[in-house]
Amino acid sequence: AFLFVLVGCGQKKETGKATKTEKDTLQSALPVIENAEKNTVVTKTLVLPKSDDGSQQTQTITYKDKTFLSLTIQQKRPVSDELKTYIDQHGVEETQKALLEAEEKDEAIIEARKLAGFKLETKLLSATELQTTTSFDFQVLDVKKASQLEYLKNIGLENLLKNEPSKYISDRLANG
């Protein structure tokens, strides 16, 4: 009877150890999963609804954990009446050249394009549609300097970066 009690106690200890080991394994795996999520680079593309004037914006946000890495805003919009008249007189190709020449003479655009991490591209997609693509690479862009430039000061880059990317995305989706 005495031997039986010892064997019973020994088995009970082993069962307790096995449960503790399983629990330790599970707990040690959780930080790995959390760290993997923090180290994952995520890219999300938001296609916002068309506005009343026919403009449509697409935003591509790339981030890692709570840090924005880049933002690309693509804006497609109908051409203005003034631009339509110019296109009718000169054609799409010549109008595209004239748009680029105008940008090359615009001091605010010239100043903004000098910033590392900022890109601006304007394309005349057709006789009726214009596309502007603005890209911000936050890994190299001097946001403070960018926010002071005439061309970029009303975009609110500093406020954008105060948000967590996931909150910015959910706000954009909620507000269109």
Predicted regions, residues:
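Bacterial signal peptide processing site
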Residues: G10-K12
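Subset-of-secretome marker
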Residues: E22-G176
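C-terminal motif of bacterial Sec signal peptides marking the signal peptidase cleavage site
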Residues: V5-G8
